[in-house]
Curated annotation (Swiss-Prot):
This is N-succinylglutamate 5-semialdehyde dehydrogenase. It catalyses: N-succinyl-L-glutamate 5-semialdehyde + NAD(+) + H2O = N-succinyl-L-glutamate + NADH + 2 H(+). NCBIfam families: arg_catab_astD, PRK09457.1. It comes from Pseudomonas syringae pv. tomato (strain ATCC BAA-871 / DC3000). GO terms for molecular function: succinylglutamate-semialdehyde dehydrogenase activity. Catalyzes the NAD-dependent reduction of succinylglutamate semialdehyde into succinylglutamate. Disulfide bonds: none annotated. One of its GO terms (biological process) is arginine catabolic process to glutamate. Coiled coil: none annotated. It holds the Pfam family Aldedh. Pathway: Amino-acid degradation; L-arginine degradation via AST pathway; L-glutamate and succinate from L-arginine: step 4/5. Its EC number is 1.2.1.71. The keyword NAD applies.
Length: 488
């Protein structure tokens, strides 16, 4: 089976055989062999050969190809949404919004490029100071499984727009979505070698990251893999590395008037996408006392009624499955570990269908757990911590190595100002779900959540490097020579 796309041609992988599965039915959706180190090297060479011609195209010419890609996405929107839902387990209503985000990324990226990395000039004495940007060259993009279309797209589109050529290594859990996306690029008329698809698992990723022919690597995924890449690129200032990783994100609840609004926002923050968004709330900080008790009682009651089901279930569920049976089991193990160390179950996370990766929402009070593990539990398991005062809540929110997202639900603007000033996170929301983000804003965090290369609207920054120039059309002597210089 031809699973790799290199130099404008489909070819069979020669590496390890792997499959993707529907996480609920466990039916095989895609099967193929990954790329070997030799095939990775062939793809890098193809991207290098394609780079000069692609980079020399005008910006408008590259935009035309990107616009054609958007047209192709729209034409295949239903097929792509179904593919995303089937391979990730997320409901069709949600996978359809992912395709819409992929389409919208084109215009957003063009706007961002012009604003952040376009051309600017200003007079400076008898010359003109000009700022332009150049592409890095050949870049690798490592995509995640939770948004297998939208998140790789967030790197690939601005990288191509800037004039780079790309080697795309998707998650081995979502190869079918990647293949369909690349076919849309082909339909858009992208020249051979400009985008190459390298399917495979860990060995393929290691070979690509280690290949000396790449000029940069853009990664979205786990902190563990991101840290390994950061160590691998240590001592290589000649290569650009952009890491977008996860978080142990806190959502602080103040004593608000509308408890139902708070409950709805908490659910949208913690359980949407079955808790598989980088910005999902992992820790819910609730005030001690009767009001906090009432909030948690209402949250548990509503969360227990959330519909969980297969991606194509009708009526549509709120939550689909997590990505795999292995992931579901790991989350259930994490819940058992917390309970064994003093956590109290408020709402048990369950596996309603044996042999399927469906999980119901779980809520556990970990206030009494000593040395709580500072890890990202990537699923629908929310940890509650009770606090005695607002200063203590902020301290608890910041008690993490991560720094991706933090949020406050409060009727007090003064408290939000304090929270914003003292929070250490790249995304800080007030009375909005943590999983909401503006397309016109950067997306990224600090600490173990990234390496200060925010993506989304700021992706243009790491896709090109600035070139500053002083220019004048004629070479003339200055009116006054520098002291000590004699020309006669």
């Amino acid at each position: 089976m031809s699973t790799l796309y290199i130099a404008g041609a489909w070819q069979a992988g020669q590496g390890e055989l792997f499959h993707s599965l529907n996480p609920v039915t466990l039916h095989v959706l895609w099967s193929g062999q990954g790329a070997t180190a030799e095939q990775v090297d062939h793809a890098v060479q193809a991207a290098r050969q394609a780079f000069p011609a692609w980079a020399l195209l005008s910006l408008d010419q590259r935009i035309a190809v990107l616009d054609a890609f958007a047209v192709s996405l729209k034409a295949h929107a239903d097929e792509l949404a179904n593919c995303i839902g089937e391979e990730t387990g997320k409901p069709l209503w949600e996978s359809a919004t992912e395709v819409t985000s992929m389409v919208n990324k084109i215009a957003i990226s063009v706007q961002s490029y012009r604003e952040r990395t376009g051309e600017k000039s200003a007079p400076l004495g008898d010359a003109t100071a000009v700022l332009r940007h150049k592409p890095h060259g050949v870049v690798a993009v490592f995509g995640p499984y939770n948004f297998p279309g939208h998140l790789p797209n967030g790197h690939i589109v601005p990288a191509l727009l800037a004039g780079n050529t790309v080697l795309f290594k998707p998650s081995e859990l979502t190869p079918k979505v990647a293949e369909l996306t690349v076919k849309c690029w082909i339909e858009a008329g992208l020249p051979a070698g400009v985008l190459n698809l390298l399917q495979g698992g860990r060995e393929t990723g290691i070979a690509l990251a280690a290949n000396p022919g790449i000029d940069g690597l853009f990664f979205t995924g786990s902190s563990r893999t991101g840290n390994a890449l950061h160590q691998q690129f240590a001592g290589r200032p000649d290569k650009i590395l952009a890491l977008e990783m996860g978080g142990n994100n806190p959502l602080v609840v103040d004593q608000v008037q509308d408890i139902d609004a708070a409950v709805y926002t908490i659910i949208q923050s913690a359980f949407i996408s079955a808790g598989q968004r980088c910005t999902c709330a992992r820790r819910l900080l609730v005030p001690e006392g009767d009001w906090g008790d009432a909030l948690l009682a209402r949250l548990v009651a509503v969360s227990a009624t959330l519909d969980v089901g297969a991606f194509d279930q009708q009526p549509a569920p709120f939550m689909g499955s997590v990505i795999s049976l292995e992931a579901a089991r790991a989350l259930l193990d994490a819940q058992r570990h917390l309970l064994a160390n003093g956590a109290v179950t408020l709402l048990e996370m369950r596996q309603p269908q044996p042999g399927a990766a469906l999980l119901t929402p779980g809520i556990v009070d970990v206030s009494a757990v000593a040395n709580r593990p500072d890890v990202e539990l990537f699923g629908p398991l929310l940890q509650v911590v009770r606090y005695a005062g607002f200063d203590a809540a902020i301290a608890e929110a910041n008690a993490t190595q991560y720094g991706l997202a933090a949020g406050l639900l409060s009727d007090s603007e003064a408290r939000y100002q304090q929270f914003w000033l003292q929070s250490r996170a790249g995304i800080v929301n007030w009375n909005k779900q943590l999983t909401g983000a503006a397309s016109s804003a950067p997306f990224g965090g600090v600490g173990a959540s990234g390496n200060h290369r925010a993506s989304a609207y700021y992706a243009a920054d790491y896709c090109a490097y600035p070139v500053a120039s002083l220019e004048t059309g004629s070479l003339t002597l200055p009116a006054t020579l520098t002291p000590g210089v004699r020309l006669s």
